[in-house]
């Protein structure tokens, strides 16, 4: 699948100091890139009330993604208690 990153997502990941967490994010991005469809992505769940918004769970953190026109946009990254206030 084609993958793109928003500036917000890139800034949130750059601020991270936890290298293990950065590695988990990289693994999630890799799994999206090799997936043939959304059903092939592990830990993916559709957000209710939104047609194109999904989240990927990585421990206590969530990656907010948008799926539009066969492109996956990595849009946000935050702790599980904060992600739903800022995304989508």
Residue map of PLM features:
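A short, compositionally biased N-terminal segment around positions ~18-40 that is enriched
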Residues: 19-38, 76
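Short, C-terminally biased terminal segments at protein or domain edges
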Residues: 1, 28-30, 50, 76, ...
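Arg/Lys-rich, positively charged N-terminal/basic patches that mediate binding to nucleic acids
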Residues: 1-28
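Enriched for short, Lys/Arg-rich terminal
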Residues: 19, 41, 58-62, 66-88
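A short, surface-exposed loop/turn module that caps and links secondary-structure elements
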Residues: 30-57
């Amino acid at each position: 699948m084609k993958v793109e990153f928003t500036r917000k997502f890139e800034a949130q990941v750059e601020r991270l100091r936890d290298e293990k967490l950065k590695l988990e994010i990289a693994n999630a991005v890799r799994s999206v890139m090799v997936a043939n469809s959304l059903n092939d992505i592990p830990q993916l769940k559709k957000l209710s009330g939104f047609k194109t918004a999904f989240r990927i769970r990585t421990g206590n953190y969530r990656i907010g993604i948008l799926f539009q026109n066969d492109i996956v946009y990595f849009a946000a990254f935050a702790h599980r208690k904060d992600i739903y206030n800022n995304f989508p």
